[in-house]
Amino acid sequence: MKFSAIIILLFALASCKGINSVLKNPDPKYKLRMAEQYYAKKKWVYAQQLYEDVMPFFRGQPEFEDIYYKYAYTAYNQKDYLNAENLFKTYLEIYPNSPKAEEVDFMRAYTFYKQSPKAELDQTNSLKAIGMFQTFINTHPGSAKNKEAGAIIDELRAKLEVKDARAAQLYYDLGQFRAAAVAFNALLENYPDTQKADEYKLMSIKSYYQFAELSIEEKKVERFGKVIEECNDFVDRFPQSGLTKEVEQYSTQSQNNLKRYTNEPAKTTT
C-alpha cells in the first residue's frame, strides 16, 4: 500500500514536471500540439492550462474557434459547470453561425441540467435548464437532440412537481389548511399532465374541509359550500377515479354541516 502511494506520487510529480516544461516553451504552436495531445488523452487540467496559455496568440486566427470550443469542454469535463456554461455562452456570441453552434447551444442548457440539485433544494438551475432546453427546441426544430431535450424537460418538471407537492403536504401537516388547498390546486394548474391529478384534488378538498371545520361559525356556511363546489368539480373532472367514494363522503359531510348551520336543505351534489 505504501509502495503504491509512492509510485502514484512519483507519477504525479513527473506529470507536473512535464506540463511545466511545456508551459515554459516559447513556441505557442508547440504548446497547442501538446494541448491537443492532452485533450485526446482526456487530461483535462493540462489541456485547459495550455489552451488558456495560447489563446492570446491565436486570437483572430482560424485555429482560435477550435481552441475555444475545446477549452469550454475542458471545464465541462472537470465538472466545472458554472464556468463551462459561461464559456459555451461566449462561444455562441463569437461564433453564432458555426457548424458547432447547435451542439454548443445544447451543451449550454445541459450545464444547468447538471447543476440541478435534489428535489428538496432550490430549483433555480432546473428552471433555467427547462427554459433553455425549450428555447433550444424552438430554435432548432429539426435537431436530433430535441428528443433528449424533451425528455430532460419532463424529468426536471417531475422534480419540480415533487418539490411543490412536498410543500403542499407540509402546509397540510402543519395545519395551514387554506394554504394547503391553494397549493394543491396550483399543482393541478402547473402540472396538467400529472398522474396524480385526482390525488391532488382530493387533498385540496380535505384541506378546504379542515379549513371550514376550524372556521368561526359566521364563515362555516361559505366554506363548507366551497368544499361542495370542489367535490362537484372532482366528479366532473375525474369520473373514473378510484377516489370518488372518499370525495362523496366529504360532500355528504359538508352538506350535513350546511343543514346544521343554515337549518335548510343543502344543495345536492351533481
Where are the language model's segments positioned?
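Acidic, polar-rich low-complexity tracts and alpha-helical solenoid repeat scaffolds
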Residues: 12-270
